């Protein structure tokens, strides 16, 4: 079954126009170690005839050197690009692959299954619309399978295909497939994943991957590729106009425009808009793009907006429709995936980056961390590498945002270490919190005094030192 178009040879321009208009689906493959994630991607590409001859020749040669399938072609090597990955037979980094069929364009994120690479998996899942959860038919649900399911739910992925892999090793048993299906549905009952589909496959042999397999006549569903091509994705989490200002454009004294990319919704000339967090109101005078003047701008377009009124608009501000305002607060509750080997501690200052807006912030309170093996809430005072927690975050100034469930782009932020400039964590906004009305006592102390106080309370709790931030 080939997805190559005859137009490539006869009319390349028409092919490119059709290709540009195809819907794009981003999906991630995840699961436990050695569940066959990379092999599945290799099989999808191979059976769809989307591998070049030189790539195939290279894989044949590498299969003999470092392959894990004996004399057979090791399709996982198509994705495992790092030398250390090939030598160990595992995935370490997030590997991205791009391909298309007659119906859709695809971006695949192949993520590592090992627990120590959970941060890599979270990074890969953050922009995906669908997840393929692989489960080894011999082993059933593993600890890391549960971990990945929880992260997919946390990151707002609404569509999941559960691929029960290595069915060839269990004699294509319907009973084993059904027991894994029942076990997964019990797990999914506590997660917010509305669309779940199941398919039994053998990535190694190609059963039910691109074409329906005669070896499992009891399975009445469709092969995996059919689901990928036809599953309906709701790309618009919200229709509300959100335009974060990236740059103020002043080429001369006669022109002042505000540049950025429309995150969601649409706006047209003459619309009344509000600038957040200031709340000032104005009207759109013109919309400019690389292609010239526009009457209307939609999500995904990079544009320049001019307004009728000379009001203060700066980088990091958010332009919205007058009555479709977002939250503005300096206090919020969020879920955090910690990605640094240095633990997250209370009251330590970090850079908090929301799209084009960067402020200083610190954890005001740990609500709890989630044991993602049991999904139970556990009390904590710090957060270690790969752990996930719900926290209360205090920012140095009010910031404009939506909840992550409403808008995955506006409701996401990253935490940056101020000393090393390394991304230390990723956050998803749950809701804003009311700012404390009482006087902020931290203004009475220097940053050094506050950090020293935090260290003393951490390492010498028997001194009963007062918390200067309260």
Curated annotation (Swiss-Prot):
Name of the protein this chain belongs to: Sulfate adenylyltransferase subunit 1
EC numbers on record: 2.7.7.4
Native source species: Francisella tularensis subsp. tularensis (strain SCHU S4 / Schu 4)
Known function: With CysD forms the ATP sulfurylase (ATPS) that catalyzes the adenylation of sulfate producing adenosine 5'-phosphosulfate (APS) and diphosphate, the first enzymatic step in sulfur assimilation pathway. APS synthesis involves the formation of a high-energy phosphoric-sulfuric acid anhydride bond driven by GTP hydrolysis by CysN coupled to ATP hydrolysis by CysD.
Stretch list, region G3: 110-113
Domain tr-type G: 22-238
Subunit structure: Heterodimer composed of CysD, the smaller subunit, and CysN.
UniProt cross-references to SUPFAM superfamilies, sorted A to Z: EF-Tu/eEF-1alpha/eIF2-gamma C-terminal domain, P-loop containing nucleoside triphosphate hydrolases, Translation proteins
Chain's gene name: cysN
Upper lineage: Bacteria, Pseudomonadati, Pseudomonadota, Gammaproteobacteria, Thiotrichales
């Amino acid at each position: 079954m080939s997805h190559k178009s005859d137009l490539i040879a006869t009319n390349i321009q028409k092919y490119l126009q059709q290709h540009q208009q195809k819907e794009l689906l981003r999906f991630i493959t995840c699961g436990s170690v050695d569940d066959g994630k990379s092999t599945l991607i290799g099989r999808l590409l191979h059976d769809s005839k989307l591998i070049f001859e030189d790539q195939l020749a290279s894989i044949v040669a590498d299969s003999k050197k470092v392959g894990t399938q004996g004399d057979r072609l090791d399709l996982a090597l198509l994705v495992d690009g790092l030398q250390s990955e090939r030598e160990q037979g595992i995935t370490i980094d997030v590997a991205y692959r791009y391909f298309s069929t007659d119906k859709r364009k695809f971006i695949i994120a192949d993520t590592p299954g090992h627990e120590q690479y959970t941060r890599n998996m979270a990074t890969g899942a953050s922009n995906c619309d669908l997840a393929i959860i692989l489960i080894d038919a011999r082993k059933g649900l593993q600890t890391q399978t549960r971990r990945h399911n929880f992260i997919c739910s946390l990151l707002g992925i609404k569509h999941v295909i559960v691929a029960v892999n290595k069915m060839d090793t269990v004699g294509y048993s319907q009973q084993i497939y059904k027991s894994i299906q029942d076990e997964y549905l019990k797990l999914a009952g506590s997660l917010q994943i509305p669309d779940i589909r199941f398919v039994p496959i053998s990535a190694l042999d190609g059963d039910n991957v691109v074409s329906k397999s005669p070896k499992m006549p009891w399975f009445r569903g469709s092969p995996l590729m059919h689901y990928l091509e036809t599953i309906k994705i709701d790309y618009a989490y919200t229709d509300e106009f959100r335009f974060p200002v990236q740059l103020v454009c002043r080429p001369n004294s006669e022109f002042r425009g505000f540049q950025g990319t429309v995150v969601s919704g649409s706006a047209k000339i003459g619309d009344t808009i509000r600038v957040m967090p200031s709340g000032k109101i104005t009207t759109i005078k013109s919309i400019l793009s690389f292609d010239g003047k526009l009457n209307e701008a939609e999500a995904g377009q990079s544009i320049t907006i001019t307004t009728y009124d000379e009001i203060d608009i700066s980088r990091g501000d958010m332009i919205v429709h007058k009555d479709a305002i977002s939250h503005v607060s300096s206090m919020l509750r969020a879920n955090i995936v910690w990605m640094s080997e240095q633990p997250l501690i209370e009251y330590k200052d970090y850079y908090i980056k929301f799209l084009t807006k960067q402020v200083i912030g610190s954890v005001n309170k740990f609500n709890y961390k989630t044991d993602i093996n049991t999904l139970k809430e556990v009390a904590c005072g710090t957060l270690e590498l790969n752990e996930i927690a719900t926290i209360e975050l205090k920012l140095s100034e009010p910031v404009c945002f939506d909840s992550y469930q409403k808008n995955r782009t506006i409701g996401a932020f990253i935490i940056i270490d101020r000393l090393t400039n390394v991304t230390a964590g990723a956050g998803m906004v749950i809701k804003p919190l009311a700012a404390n009305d009482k006087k902020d006592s931290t203004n009475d102390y220097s940053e050094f005094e506050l950090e020293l106080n935090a260290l003393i309370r951490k390492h010498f709790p028997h001194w009963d030192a007062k918390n200067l931030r309260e």
